[in-house]
Amino acid sequence: MKIKTDEVTSVLKQEIKNFKKDLQVEEVGTVLEVGDGIARVYGLTNVMSGELVEFQNGVRGQAFNLEENSVGVVIFGDYIKIEEGFSVKRVGKIFEVPVGPELLGRVLNPLGEVIDGKGPLNAKKTRPVESPAPGIAMRKSVHEPMQTGIKAIDAMIPIGRGQRELIIGDRGTGKTSIAIDTIINQKGKGVICVYVAIGQKASTVASTIEMLREKGALEYTIIVSANASEPAPMLYIAPYSGATMAEYFMYEEGKATLVVYDDLSKQAVAYRQMSLLLRRPPGREAYPGDVFYLHSRLLERAAKLDDKFGGGSMTALPIIETQEGEVSAYIPTNVISITDGQIYLQSNLFASGLRPAVDVGISVSRVGSAAQIKAMKKVAGTLKSDLAQFRDLEAFAQLGTELDPVTQAQLDRGYRVLEILKQPNNSPTPVEEQVISIFAVTKGFMDVVPTAKVREFEAFLLKTMREQHPEILEEIRTAKEVKQEAALQKTIKSIVEHFLAKNN
């Protein structure tokens, strides 16, 4: 076959005419200095605040400080491998994380990368980490209960779906335990949970994950972990990543979600470290001036959405660690003013054997009472004030004065109430059983039971109710109120008599 030269020429001319080279213009800067998770970059003149940038070794960062001659970049990842003189290019988008049902049961870092060794994530969608909180028109007032399974909280400091309830207390008072119990208690209720571990030891996070797996709670939970060994920017961004993952289920699937931030004190410390390294002016306790906004923009994302917007909700349980019970420090007062109430745990109550060590006097739920079920409202209505009176009487009795029979009876009942409110870790109680226990103690049925045997009697009472009177429990569970009070009183009275006869 002979090739004609004029044909070759015409084909070549046509190809040359159609040839277009895609020129990609990238704005590239240079690292001037780097250290402690922060880099100062020269040359990115058009970079926008909050925009992602990429270093030549693939590590990403975010433009944080826009200055006259340089840009302060926070580095998400291993900053040790970044050197002076490295090139940095703009990515042209903001920070996003993967979202969707594929994340359930997985352990991720704040960048949305899996760290549990169970294979790739295969998430189909992403959402921006910094997203605005829902507006007033999108919200609905809190009216559905978010049961924690903890008697002291569900009875006296009730939490509703869409609420922000702070858990505050010294180190080792059981703050994380309350949050984990609440997650375990959501089993079978269609609530998606996100647990954000900020600045914790890897071993602590591992044992928490194991506990959730044991209780069958991991299948509806996403774990976001920024360990203590991670650089400050990772600890700073972790809560926002967790909130974004929950927002997907709230907005796009109309589901109820629960997010635990454990704990925001460490996030504030990480943010302070970043701000000081970026040479931002320090304020009170060396925190930057916008540390309030750091937490308010995070916690305002929790809401109960109106039915027009799917009716989903995000309940936030932020945790704050205090030093020596100092609730009036900067970060605790900030978060108390942002949230809809707080559960205050006291170390001396914890040491005295009251667990959970909830200080009912200081603890409050500003919007939760609207979400409490009728049955609980009825039986526990005066419980908080009764306990406050009991504490006053207890202090008075310690003076050694002789007490009249009425005061003594009030004291004795107070001790029995405290026994009922004690609860072991990782064993949340269904709300219908809580109602029975509190009804029995507040109506005086346990006054004849010795204080030392109150918890034994409670176990016997609930076991008998489950086996012989399941219809009463079912009625409370479904109707959410005690309809046949006289019948319930009669039942409990006979169970008390049976217990005393058995133990004498």
UniProtKB/Swiss-Prot annotation:
This is ATP synthase subunit alpha. It is a peripheral membrane protein. The keyword Nucleotide-binding applies. GO terms for cellular component: plasma membrane; proton-transporting ATP synthase complex. The record marks S363 as: Required for activity. It catalyses: ATP + H2O + 4 H(+)(in) = ADP + phosphate + 5 H(+)(out). Its main location: membrane. Pfam families: ATP-synt_ab, ATP-synt_ab_C, ATP-synt_ab_N. Keywords: ATP synthesis, ATP-binding, Cell inner membrane, Cell membrane, CF(1), Hydrogen ion transport, Ion transport, Membrane, Nucleotide-binding, Translocase, Transport. It is found in: Cell inner membrane. Produces ATP from ADP in the presence of a proton gradient across the membrane. The alpha chain is a regulatory subunit. InterPro entries: ATP_synth_asu-like_sf (IPR023366), ATP_synth_asu_C (IPR000793), ATP_synth_asu_C_sf (IPR038376), ATP_synth_F1_a_nt-bd_dom (IPR033732), ATP_synth_F1_asu (IPR005294), ATPase_a/bsu_AS (IPR020003), ATPase_F1/V1/A1_a/bsu_N (IPR004100), ATPase_F1/V1/A1_a/bsu_N_sf (IPR036121). GO terms for molecular function: ADP binding; ATP binding; proton-transporting ATP synthase activity, rotational mechanism. Belongs to the ATPase alpha/beta chains family. Its EC number is 7.1.2.2. F-type ATPases have 2 components, CF(1) - the catalytic core - and CF(0) - the membrane proton channel. CF(1) has five subunits: alpha(3), beta(3), gamma(1), delta(1), epsilon(1). CF(0) has three main subunits: a(1), b(2) and c(9-12). The alpha and beta chains form an alternating ring which encloses part of the gamma chain. CF(1) is attached to CF(0) by a central stalk formed by the gamma and epsilon chains, while a peripheral stalk is formed by the delta and b chains. ATP binds at G169, D170, R171, G172, T173, G174, K175, T176.
